[in-house]
Amino acid sequence: MELRLVDLVKDFSGTKAVDTGSFSISDGKLTGLLGPSGCGKSTLLYLISGLLKPTSGRIFFGDRDVTELPPEKRGIGLVFQNYALYPHMTVAQNIAFPLVNRKENRELIQQKTQQMAKLVQVEELLSRKPGQLSGGQQQRVAIA
């Protein structure tokens, strides 16, 4: 699904943190954000994910305008360089953690944990701890 930013601007107290103009990123295209510290790379990602609201402009995924949608309705996730896995917990426990916090029933937690582990191809690693995984495996667990 194509990501399209149209005249996206974010101001903080009159200072422009982001002023993208308009551009799009095609589905499946690997894209990097490069620039010096403080140039707005993280702010742009926060805008796309819905963690910040733009001052002006629009954000589209495919034909869908997601500018006003809350983060949980956008279907977008971020995976940071520090994957924030709990080192004392197994892969299964890390994947299940959000569901446990929402007090979902045990059967649903087990089902969703297996489903997500299979989706990101870590089902053989469920009993391991993050320190026993490669960086790529840790990233896939964080995505799950």
Map each language-model feature to its residues.
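ABC family nucleotide-binding domain
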Residues: 1-144
